[in-house]
Amino acid sequence: MFANSLRRITKPCLGVPDMAVRHIAMRPKPKVKVNSREGGGKGKPRPSTGVRRKPPGAQKQQPASIAINGDAARRLLESKFAANISSFNELKLHPDVRAVLPDVIQLPEHKQDQDIKPSIIQSLAVKIMRQSYTYKQRVKNEGEEPTVEKIPVDRQKTFVLAAQTGSGKTLAYLLPLLSDLKDQEKFPSWQLEKHYKTVRSVILVPTLELSQQVGQVLKQFEEPLGIKTFASAFGQSHQEIAKAFNNRLDVLVTTPQKLQQTREKNLGGATHLVVDEADTLFDTNFIDSTTDVISQMPKLKCAAFVAATVSKSFLRKLRSFYPHVVVIAAPRLHAIPDHIRFSVVDVNKAPYYNNKKVALLQALYAISHSQKQKNYVRRVVVFRNRKEHIPELKKFLEENGYPVDTLHGKQDLHERNEVVEKYTNMPDAADQTENARNVRVLLTTDIASRGMDMKNLRFVVLYDVPFDKTDFIHRVGRTGRFGREGEVYMFTDNQDKKAQTNQLLHTSRNGLSL
């Protein structure tokens, strides 16, 4: 079977010669990477066009290391701490937030009596971000007995939260955020503030698809915690948005562009900010709208910038606004997890003879006969570099009997929303009749590679070699999420640059800096 030949080079099958397929072993990376030279990278951040407003809390740039791993000794201690955490009960969470977790993290039936173990990035985020919320005491004389009141220290904390795709980063930033919002409700001032028409915290994301996904997670906390949330979504009317801002909002999830278009917003009271997929929201297409929105939050106490890929240029850019940002990075950042089986298929060699379509049919045939996920329709995400190439491949697959969905930027919002809902929900049960293929293909571009949690997705095909290491990591990261097994096939031919392909594979093994 083709799938077996992908797993081990030494096992030929279906007439596929060993030289056509390379299985890439994910070699373990050393636990600690020693910090690079202090003093920042070469050159200065590229100047932007036009006027850009610096966010509140932004300071004059200071020399700072751009190495994402920071101090080696501190990283080692943090990793050991996270590895020793066996339950959320050991972390400093608000009791009400902790009580909701069993309903949010749905365990299989045979594990429901066990404690829920946080991922490494969740343990690190809660430990470091919650310890950084500092308060001071103020003695008040009321009547005969003096009282001691806790008030928050007026100082902004800024973090970068970096971990592999599928490692639970959404909960890693939501748990400290929600715990701190609940802690604020203990202060006497809350009795007045709870009636204000204001937004207490903002989560910025690059797409409405991701906004809906984060909003669905937040909805599970809403009633138990007594909080009010709102997430921007497809097809919302202006009246719906205006109604949401007409009351107190504890958590707002939206895109920078959507927020700029909303006239009723009141961000002046927001104390917490999360920028999810921050490397995207700080690139040239988004940075002006992102920084404009952040500048409207003068009372920020805590800001977290979350990403699966943290390049030196991104970190340098972020430190131009926040020189003392604290980096919270999980081990093996930028490396493909060991539970993902990664294989390279050289389509120049027999039996494909430079025909990627034949290689794709062979891969889909093997997947349809796999013993993995045999109780469900097996969903396969096939990535292409350009949306213009999707219609032709869709027609070819449909002519060969495969049901195909597409997701790309040229589709209208309603069509995109239908596809997103289909793949972020559980797959359909398998057709048990003989010769049923039980495979469904999603043809897409990078629009589906960022943040989307596709339920029970095991198989990914990189039909085109990604343009760069960042795209590569995000595409591969659609499978193998939350420790589940995944399989990735990357097709290469003579048109692909050997140096670029080898560089991607080197990154996948070692988790090198971008």
Swiss-Prot record:
Residues 359-514 form the Helicase C-terminal domain. A motif (Q motif) lies at residues 115-122. A motif (DEAD box) lies at residues 276-279. One of its GO terms (biological process) is maturation of LSU-rRNA from tricistronic rRNA transcript (SSU-rRNA, 5.8S rRNA, LSU-rRNA). Residues 26-64 are annotated as: Disordered. Its main location: mitochondrion. GO terms for molecular function: ATP binding; ATP hydrolysis activity; RNA binding; RNA helicase activity. It holds the Pfam family DEAD. It comes from the Eukaryota. Keywords: ATP-binding, Helicase, Hydrolase, Mitochondrion, Nucleotide-binding, RNA-binding, Transit peptide. Residues 150-328 form the Helicase ATP-binding domain. Residues 1-55 form a transit peptide. ATP binds at A163, Q164, T165, G166, S167, G168, K169, T170. Its EC number is 3.6.4.13. It catalyses: ATP + H2O = ADP + phosphate + H(+). GO terms for cellular component: mitochondrion; nucleolus. SMART domains: DEXDc, HELICc. It is found in: Mitochondrion. ATP-binding RNA helicase involved in mitochondrial RNA metabolism. Required for maintenance of mitochondrial DNA. Belongs to the DEAD box helicase family. MRH4 subfamily. The Q motif is unique to and characteristic of the DEAD box family of RNA helicases and controls ATP binding and hydrolysis. This is ATP-dependent RNA helicase MRH4, mitochondrial.
